[in-house]
Amino acid sequence: MTNEADAHTRQPALDGKKVLVTGGTTGIGRAIAVLLASYGAEIFICSRDPRHLEDALRRIGEVGKAHGIAIDLADPDNVKLFFDAGVSALGGIDAAIINAAIPAEGISTMSEEDLRYAIAVDFTAYLLSAHAAAQALEDHGDIIFVGSMAAHMLGAESSVYAGMKKGVQGFSEALRKELAPKNIKTCLIEPGKTGADFQYKDFTAQEQAEAIRKEEMLRAEDIAVGVHYVLTQPNRAIVQQLTIAPRQQPKE
């Protein structure tokens, strides 16, 4: 006889769930899309680069089902277009993973054009995506923000990136309280240093691989496992914030 005290008796299955992932073609977003698809979720992704989109859809198609469009979420109008396309393709959604982001440096070293673009992708698109997700979910489901430990580890060249991630952190906490009465869960996942397709400044792919081997850096798949954990909690439980750090991440 099943023991109802066992939390796993209420663990929801991902099979058949409809999930949007902003980004979803490289790095953390791609790892999330592949893992969730392997558990039976149907995925909708986007990319600025049609080549990345085609490659990601091929990979996800090896383990599950996915759709996507080539679109740049830096354009505010494109966020709604992406969500409308996803809802149409999937027939509704059960979760939105707001993940698409680009690197940014210190404000004194960035051009105004690059600064505006970073804000559009890393902050404005996050809020607009949450707005679209809340409307699409209506009265159930999950919104997961992929933030960064950069919100807490403030370096000399991180003013823009850390500032935006700090903003996402505060927004996520307030939104969680706002949407709770509507049966929509909101979680913020904050990864530490994670191997990325966009290169860290002065940190080559070979150096990233060595850092991962030394457990000083995470793999994108580690964050995907965290997303899976959040999405498979019983309805009575919510993971409000999840920090995932390398065991040996050096202090900044």
Q: What is each stretch, according to the model?
A:
Residues 130, 164-165:
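Active-site helix of classical SDR
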Residues 148:
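Residue(s) in the substrate-gating loop at a strand-loop-helix junction
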Residues 188-189, 208-252:
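C-terminal helical subdomain
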Residues 39-55:
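Conserved glycine-rich Rossmann-like NAD(P)H-binding loop of the short-chain dehydrogenase/reductase
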Residues 106-119:
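Substrate-binding pocket helix/loop in short-chain dehydrogenase/reductase
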Residues 25-26:
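Conserved glycine-rich cofactor-binding loop
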Residues 50, 70-82, 112:
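The beta1-alpha1 cofactor-binding region of Rossmann-like NAD(H)/NADP(H)-dependent oxidoreductases
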